[in-house]
Amino acid sequence: MEPPSNRPLTLSRIVALTIIGLLVLGLAYLCLAGSGSTVSVPSGAHAGELTLKPCHYATERGSYAADCGTLVVPENRHQAGSRLIALPVTRIRARTARPGTPVFRLQGGPGITNMEFAAASRLAAGRDVVLVGYRGVDGSVRLDCPEVDSAMRRAADLAGAKAIDAYATAYRSCAERLRSGGVDLGGYSLPERVDDLEAARRALGYRHVDLVSESAGTRTAMIYAWRYPKSVERSVMIAVNPPGNFIWYPGITDEQVRKYAKLCAHDGSCSSRTGDLAVTLHSTPVPHRWWFLPIREGNVRIATFFGLMNATPAAAGPISAPRTIDAWLAAANGDPSGLWLQSVMAQLVFPSAQVHGDLAAVARSDAAAAKRYFAGAHDHGSILGDTSSSFLFADGRIISAWPAGPDDNAYSRVRTSRVPTLLVSGDLDFATPPQTAARELLPHLPNGHQVVLKNLGHADDFWAYEPAAGSQLVNTFLASGRVDASRFTTNRIDFTPRMPQTVLAKIVLLVMVALASLTILSMLLLPLRVHRRGRVGRRSAVAIRSAGLVVIGLGGWLGGVLLALTAMPTVPLDSELLLGVSVGAPVGLTVYWAWVDRGWTAATKATGLAAALAGALVGAWLGGYAAPVPLAVLTAIAGAAAGGNLLVLVLDMVRQPAATAAPARTRTSPSPA
């Protein structure tokens, strides 16, 4: 073995320390960039004050000139002297010198930001497009409920009885914590949100505005038109949700299932797999396992309902309705792999999909309907059951868990509106079926129209399918009140998706097992190599302690996920502890075995092992907090690599001067006589 250099800071160590420093700075930036609210009430501000400055807004057609700023509003307009809160406002400027009536865009949800709208470029050619942040989601006060998030993440089954109990308790605890922290929950309602929009309209100096809303956002648009009819010129509602319909009623859902069953019966590939799709969906049991992997029935039924919302793969990707149906048909024929994939995706996605405090506050808009629905036997043997409604409303208990507000019953029934309104529905939409809008809202719109798009589903389908046709429909109506759906063609439902969930599931499992096995194999081969050869070669060690750690860390995490799925059902798959240990331990051991020399003393080896493991575990834990999953996996690996390598480098620099300062043991020749 070559004698060690007597210089603690060699060129290679300087390079390594520089790379580690850059990794640490990058992780620190991610932590700081993702923390805290970016909106606050300016000093000395008053209610209704709007401050704007030039900015740019990213759209699907590139960056558009815009104005960004803050609107100050009272937290609760029912309370004199209520404190002020701030909301973000973005105005994407019209691309014309003579713009038409500006449009306010209203996102769905609940619990989803109103500040992201890449399709703004489809509307901004002739008018300003304005985004006003939703109170409770986008503003200086955010109704986050980590109690609810945690209860969902730790649920053995998202729709299980124990989980529902935990959700109700968590919502109550969240409300109590927010109130004790000074949040006036009575101010977080849809009418208050509408008053925010009206305040923005006045502050911007607009005489009238148009509204383009979708899904839950259509309820806000309805209330705006009922509350301020003179302020709204025209309204386009996509995926319409009249009062009382935040609940998904099993009977109406059955009507939508039968539409798919009819399409299936006329499709050769689908009809060859089932005589009646509706019967197959109703009668096929959810198996407990796929091979050694458990399948959680409640997760599957929730994922199935959401998977059936959108009919086009462009809108829904791997969870589109054709893929969801294909997974059930495969399960009916003995291959439940697609249902396992649905179960895992539900477990990963739903706990963090929404701001749950806003969901609870908005759900109270349908408090009366929810009480009626959940008071009796609400599922009478329907095809899919009512698992999704029970999950969303915690079996109705969210209504009692979240405090009542002064606006709960203000708009619980449909009112008449003379605002020219266009209702746009997909005929296969499970969340907001077109027949509901036709029966419950359209009769109350003397100047209303409805367009039902054949073989399309929820709002995402509208934006993804034939964008030019959708833009013409919306822009023509906003400009003239005329309905022009002439450019739409009928979507064809493909019951043989190119990448079915069954194939995706097998690919996912193969990758998980392969990388986990590679990590385990590396943990066995590296010590064996050190035992046989004394140490890992310098070039190999550099490769292993850098790029190799990405594979080792990823395989470690996937192995941890497999362990959690099979043996620890209440451990969240995105658990910080699971991530830290499953990444940190193999990365630390790999750093150690790529660093150690067989000839070193036992004390040096033990110190090195402790340093590598401690640095990697702490680094993985800290890195896991730098970003949300799945990006957190990479930041945890980066943190583990930085921590493990840093401590063994420091150990090298500390011990090397001492080693070189020790007297050399040399063999001398005897002097001649």
Question: How should each PLM-predicted stretch be described?
Answer:
Residues 179, 191-208:
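Conserved acidic catalytic loop of the alpha/beta-hydrolase fold
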Residues 145, 150-155, 223-280, 304, ...:
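A catalytic-pocket lid/entrance helix-loop region that shapes and gates access to the active site
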Residues 206-216:
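Alpha/beta-hydrolase fold nucleophile elbow
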Residues 55-88:
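N-terminal cap/lid segment of alpha/beta-hydrolase-fold proteins
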Residues 10-16, 28-38, 277-419, 498-584, ...:
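Alpha/beta-hydrolase fold active-site neighborhood
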